[in-house]
C-alpha cells in the first residue's frame, strides 16, 4: 500500500456512470467512496444543523448552495484524514473546488465525457429508490421486479428532473458549472479525461491510472 494517502475526485454529468466507476475503484483499491448525495441524505435524516439547512432548499426544489454543501463535505473529510478517499459529487463548482484546496491537495481528478444524446437516453430510463438512493436503469441495470427496489421491494420513482423534458436543461447547467472546475484541475496537471459510452470499456484505463498511484487490494480487476 502506498505510504501517501490518495486523494481523488470523480467528475461527470448526470447519467455518466460515475456511481458504477466509483464502486469499482473503491472495491479494487480500498478507497472510501465519499458521495455528497449520501452525506446529504444522512445529515437530513439525522436532523443535524447542516442537514436542516440543506433540507430547507431541497424542499423548495432549489439547489443546495455552495456554503452549505461545502460545510457539510469539509466536516465529513475532516473525520477521514487518515483514509484514502474518492470524492463523488463534490466539488461541483469553482467555489467548492477552492474550498477543498484549503483542506488538501488532490492527486487525481477523473472526468467522464459521455455524448449528450447517450446521457439524455440514459437519464430518461433512470428510476430511483429515494430512501436509499439506489439507482436503476431500465436498459443496463433493471430491477429484478419491474418498478420495485431489489432490496426492500418498495416502489421506484422517476425523478421530475429525469423526465426527458428536464434532462437537456440539467446537462447544459452541468456543462456551464463544471467547465471552470475542469479547467482548474487541467491547469494543475491532475486531470484525466475518459470518453466513451460504456463503463466496461472505460474501466480498464481507469484501473491502470489508479494502479500507478496506489497498490490494488485485489490481485485482478473486479468488474
From Swiss-Prot:
Top EC class, one word: transferase
Modified residues (N6-succinyllysine): 60, 179, 186
Residues that coordinate or bind AMP: 36, 41, 62-64, 89-92, 96, 170
Nucleus among keywords: no
Annotated GO biological process: ADP biosynthetic process; AMP metabolic process; ATP metabolic process; cellular response to hypoxia; GTP metabolic process; nucleoside triphosphate biosynthetic process; regulation of oxidative phosphorylation; ribonucleoside diphosphate biosynthetic process
One of the record's GO cellular component terms: cytoplasm
EC number: 2.7.4.4, 2.7.4.6
GO molecular function: adenylate kinase activity; ATP binding; CMP kinase activity; dCMP kinase activity; deoxyadenylate kinase activity; GTP binding; nucleoside diphosphate kinase activity; nucleoside triphosphate adenylate kinase activity
Cross-referenced SUPFAM superfamilies: Microbial and mitochondrial ADK, insert 'zinc finger' domain (SSF57774), P-loop containing nucleoside triphosphate hydrolases (SSF52540)
Coiled-coil region list: none
Protein name, UniProt field: Adenylate kinase 4, mitochondrial
Localization of this protein: Mitochondrion matrix
ATP-binding recorded as keyword: yes
Modified sites of kind N6-acetyllysine: 175, 179, 186
This protein's domain notes: Consists of three domains, a large central CORE domain and two small peripheral domains, NMPbind and LID, which undergo movements during catalysis. The LID domain closes over the site of phosphoryl transfer upon GTP/ATP binding. Assembling and dissambling the active center during each catalytic cycle provides an effective means to prevent GTP/ATP hydrolysis.
Subunit structure: Monomer. Interacts with SLC25A5/ANT2.
Binding positions for a ribonucleoside 5'-triphosphate per the UniProt entry: 15-20, 126, 135-136, 199
Pfam families: ADK, ADK_lid
Keywords: Acetylation, ATP-binding, GTP-binding, Kinase, Mitochondrion, Nucleotide-binding, Transferase
Taxonomic source organism: Bos taurus
Catalysed reactions listed for this entry: a ribonucleoside 5'-phosphate + ATP = a ribonucleoside 5'-diphosphate + ADP; AMP + ATP = 2 ADP; GTP + AMP = GDP + ADP; CMP + ATP = CDP + ADP
Stated family: Belongs to the adenylate kinase family. AK3 subfamily.
InterPro entries (UniProt xref): Adenyl_kin_sub, Adenylat/UMP-CMP_kin, Adenylat_kinase_CS, Adenylate_kinase_lid-dom, ADK_active_lid_dom_sf, AK3/Ak4_mitochondrial, AK4_mitochondrial, P-loop_NTPase
LID, as annotated region: 125-162
